[in-house]
Curated annotation (Swiss-Prot):
PANTHER family: NADH DEHYDROGENASE [UBIQUINONE] IRON-SULFUR PROTEIN 3, MITOCHONDRIAL, NADH DEHYDROGENASE UBIQUINONE IRON-SULFUR PROTEIN 3. It holds the Pfam family Complex1_30kDa. Belongs to the complex I 30 kDa subunit family. Transmembrane segments: none annotated. The gene is ndhJ. Keywords: Membrane, NAD, NADP, Plastoquinone, Quinone, Thylakoid, Translocase, Transport. InterPro entries: NADH_DH_suC (IPR010218), NADH_quin_OxRdtase_su_C/D-like (IPR037232), NADH_UbQ_OxRdtase_30kDa_su (IPR001268), NADH_UbQ_OxRdtase_CS (IPR020396). NDH-1 can be composed of about 15 different subunits; different subcomplexes with different compositions have been identified which probably have different functions. GO terms for molecular function: NADH dehydrogenase (ubiquinone) activity; quinone binding. It comes from the Bacteria. This is NAD(P)H-quinone oxidoreductase subunit J.
Amino acid sequence: MAEENAQEKQAPPSAGEQSEPLVTLERGPVSQFLADNGFEHQYLGRDAAGVELLEVERDFLLPLCTALYAYGFNYLECQCGYDLGAGQPLVSLYHLIKLSDGADRPQEVRLQVKLPRQDPRLPSVYWIWKSADWQERETYDMYGIVFEGHPNLKRILMPEDWIGWPLRKDYITPDFYELQDAY
């Protein structure tokens, strides 16, 4: 698997499309470190800011995150979720930073995990980076992604009795919601 990921190529165009040259994506340093150490992932290239983007299967998230923490990625800047559309997977995204003394610019990497809508579960990274606490709770509250092993996974923005996941693209807003008086 590691050899397959060494260089990713775009699929050849179909009969109706114009032929363009195949683009070869060379691994970044983080992806190369993970591949050299046997961690399965897919290298998706770099974003506009030059940050590596990796896709990880949910079963490999914790081992891969533990390896990245040991490699020096000591700060989870952001964990968020998003919906690719009705019938499409949900995504949990992690933006990790390697902060070190004397560095001109911190090293960064983004991980994404695609989850089926019917079973959006994955392990919590709270035990690696404590900054995941409220971020995972917000993602749970808005998208219904369950972070197994989180110490206090409950709604953080919506009322506890709210039904549904408001930021999913297939969410239907209720016509009426009765707020309980706090007194």
